[in-house]
UniProtKB/Swiss-Prot annotation:
Keyword annotations from UniProtKB, A to Z: Membrane, Mitochondrion, Mitochondrion inner membrane, Transmembrane, Transmembrane helix
Nucleotidyltransferase among keywords: no
Positions in the Mitochondrial intermembrane compartment: 27-118
Alphabetical GO biological process terms: cristae formation
Name of the protein described by the UniProt record: MICOS complex subunit MIC13
Keyword Membrane: yes
Species: Macaca fascicularis (Crab-eating macaque)
Mitochondrial matrix side: 1-7
Cellular compartment(s): Mitochondrion inner membrane
Length: 118
């Protein structure tokens, strides 16, 4: 009984995390124009390090542990605008030709099997 409840809880937690991620991507319009994607990435770069520092300070206060000071993350310039839409276009292009390629490959496979059985 406990195993079933535990597996159900794991499923619900994983589903909630996945649903939250999908909602966040949709709400922030991350699959839309690259301007919004780049702005969201920049916003995350500004917000996440202070949040991690604040959380580590909270953990130190609650547990009494001393967490060593981490070095500052390097500043990396990656022009996401140049590659984001290209990646989306490539994936969508591959998905659009998948049915015809599957038909073509299955036809070739069928011809191969027919040739081998003769």
């Amino acid at each position: 009984m406990v195993a079933r409840v535990w597996s159900l809880m794991r499923f619900l937690i994983k589903g909630s995390v996945a649903g939250g991620a999908v909602y966040l991507v949709y709400d922030q319009e991350l699959l839309g124009p690259s301007d919004k994607s780049q702005a969201a990435l920049q916003k995350a770069g500004e917000v996440v390090p202070p949040a991690v520092y604040q959380f580590s300070q909270y953990v130190c206060q609650q547990t009494g542990l001393q967490i060593p000071q981490l070095p500052a993350p390097p500043k990396i310039y990656f022009p996401i605008r140049d590659s984001w839409n290209a990646g989306i276009m490539t994936v969508m292009s591959a998905l659009s030709v998948a049915p015809s390629k599957a038909r073509e490959y299955s036809k070739e496979g069928w011809e191969y099997v027919k040739a081998r059985t003769k």
